């Protein structure tokens, strides 16, 4: 499949993309390959979703407009689901706090409890940050 990809054949389905990823990871020992392919597929599909949906641009725009939507003393809490989002929120809150726009911001990220993660496995990567205007 990797050879076909190099020859310019298109990747039309998620299965095609998975096969390309599997081919690229052939060098990994068989015992570790299944997990490596799974993780690589997750990251690849996440990156495609982020790009297709312009998620960083939308989040950046939201963070720029957020102070205008809050009254004095108003509070905002934002849940992020991966490090790229969290980095944007953290930097925005920190910079606007230093500029005097926010009176307080979270200095530590709030993470779900082990109990919540056991009930909802998708909560595992979630982080929450807050700011007060």
Language model features with spans:
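S-adenosyl-L-methionine-dependent methyltransferase catalytic core, i.e., the SAM/SAH-binding region
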Residues: 1-133
